[in-house]
């Protein structure tokens, strides 16, 4: 399996690995904007923004997003860690363009409505409650705080109830504009396809993404 890399004019890195033995297509977008890039007042915003991304776009509702993934027989995932926020979709190889278009729509055209923001904030509060009642999570959080103190690595990826309560649409929109740009994104895919095709589809669906500036760890 050969790995190839092309950098688009807007800074987006396009990486492919061809695998002729599989009938599946896996695509992911990795954004260089995990919790290490947050200020203390922003703590939790990277994870919050990740949650909001699948809630609807200018062309699709949340239900339509989920229905399209189901119709394709695919599955999607998203996660946030200290360094990155990532989004992925897996479908049959013949549905690869549909997956790329959907992922681009989700990342470029998400609409963060006040109702969805309030609803998703409560979802994250529930995640916090579950973590607070999980001994492994409590240990890991305590260890990070002890070792790193007030540095970004010492803060919880989920944020706190105080910081999340102060994060609204203006803050989420600003975070997305700052972080979800060509200089911060890597589009990576694996399956039975040619690298040149992936580059062409990346230019077609991600070409309007602004270059922006590379995010700096705090």
Spans of model-derived segments:
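N- or domain-start disorder-to-order transition segments that initiate the globular core
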Residues: 1-24
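Charge-rich, well-structured scaffold segments of protease-associated domains
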Residues: 2, 7, 62-217
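Hydrophobic alpha-helical segments, principally membrane-spanning helices and signal/leader peptides
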Residues: 13, 32, 46, 134-135, ...
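Structured core elements
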Residues: 15, 28, 186-189
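Short, solvent-exposed loop/turn elements at beta->coil junctions and helix N-caps
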Residues: 17, 217-218
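M16/MPP (pitrilysin/insulinase) zinc-metallopeptidase core fold and M16-derived inactive scaffolds
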Residues: 21, 26-90
């Amino acid at each position: 399996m050969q790995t190839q890399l092309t950098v688009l004019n807007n800074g987006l890195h396009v990486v492919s690995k061809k695998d002729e033995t599989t009938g599946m297509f896996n695509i992911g977008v990795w954004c260089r904007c995990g919790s290490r890039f947050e200020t203390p007042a922003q703590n939790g915003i990277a994870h919050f923004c990740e949650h909001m991304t699948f809630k609807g776009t200018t062309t699709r509702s949340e239900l339509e997003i989920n229905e399209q993934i189901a119709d394709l027989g695919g599955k999607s995932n998203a996660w946030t860690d200290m360094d990155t926020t990532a989004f992925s979709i897996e479908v049959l190889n013949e549905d690869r363009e549909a997956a790329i278009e959907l992922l681009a729509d989700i990342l470029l055209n998400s609409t963060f409505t006040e109702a969805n923001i309030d609803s998703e904030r409560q979802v994250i509060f529930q995640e916090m409650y579950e973590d607070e009642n999980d001994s492994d999570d409590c240990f890991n959080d305590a260890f990070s705080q002890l070792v790193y103190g007030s540095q970004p690595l010492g803060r919880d990826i989920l944020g706190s109830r105080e910081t999340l309560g102060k994060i609204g649409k203006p803050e989420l929109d600003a975070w997305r504009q700052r972080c979800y740009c060509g200089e911060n994104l890597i589009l990576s895919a694996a399956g039975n396809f040619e690298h040149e095709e992936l580059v062409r589809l990346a230019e077609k669906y991600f070409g309007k993404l602004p270059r922006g500036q590379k995010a700096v760890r705090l």
